[in-house]
Swiss-Prot record:
<dbReference type="InterPro" id="IPR000783">
    <property type="entry name" value="RNA_pol_subH/Rpb5_C"/>
</dbReference>
<comment type="function">
    <text>DNA-dependent RNA polymerase (RNAP) catalyzes the transcription of DNA into RNA using the four ribonucleoside triphosphates as substrates.</text>
</comment>
<dbReference type="GO" id="GO:0003677">
    <property type="term" value="F:DNA binding"/>
</dbReference>
<dbReference type="GO" id="GO:0003899">
    <property type="term" value="F:DNA-directed RNA polymerase activity"/>
</dbReference>
<dbReference type="InterPro" id="IPR014381">
    <property type="entry name" value="Arch_Rpo5/euc_Rpb5"/>
</dbReference>
<dbReference type="GO" id="GO:0042797">
    <property type="term" value="P:tRNA transcription by RNA polymerase III"/>
</dbReference>
<keyword id="KW-0804">Transcription</keyword>
<dbReference type="GO" id="GO:0006366">
    <property type="term" value="P:transcription by RNA polymerase II"/>
</dbReference>
<dbReference type="GO" id="GO:0006362">
    <property type="term" value="P:transcription elongation by RNA polymerase I"/>
</dbReference>
<dbReference type="Pfam" id="PF01191">
    <property type="entry name" value="RNA_pol_Rpb5_C"/>
</dbReference>
<keyword id="KW-0240">DNA-directed RNA polymerase</keyword>
<comment type="subunit">
    <text>Part of the RNA polymerase complex.</text>
</comment>
<protein>
    <recommendedName>
        <fullName>DNA-directed RNA polymerase subunit Rpo5</fullName>
        <ecNumber>2.7.7.6</ecNumber>
    </recommendedName>
</protein>
<comment type="similarity">
    <text>Belongs to the archaeal Rpo5/eukaryotic RPB5 RNA polymerase subunit family.</text>
</comment>
<keyword id="KW-0808">Transferase</keyword>
<dbReference type="GO" id="GO:0005737">
    <property type="term" value="C:cytoplasm"/>
</dbReference>
<keyword id="KW-0963">Cytoplasm</keyword>
Amino acid sequence: MSKFSLLDHELIPHHEIMDEDDLKTVLTHYNVEREQLPKLKVTDPIALEIGAEPGDVVKVIRKSQTAGEALYYRYVIG
């Protein structure tokens, strides 16, 4: 039996760990520090699956009926 991937489920939005260059752009655009972003526990099943570590920022790309895509950012904590 193969392992089920949460990311393959249709109700789970796409998650990706941001690189530092993209992160700086986002933080500057919103005029925030990474610690001010909503939190995501390192023990969250999605964080475990994508290999997120404390201090990372995860970009969540959700489908939106009005905007097409909506971007959310989460700061990974221990």
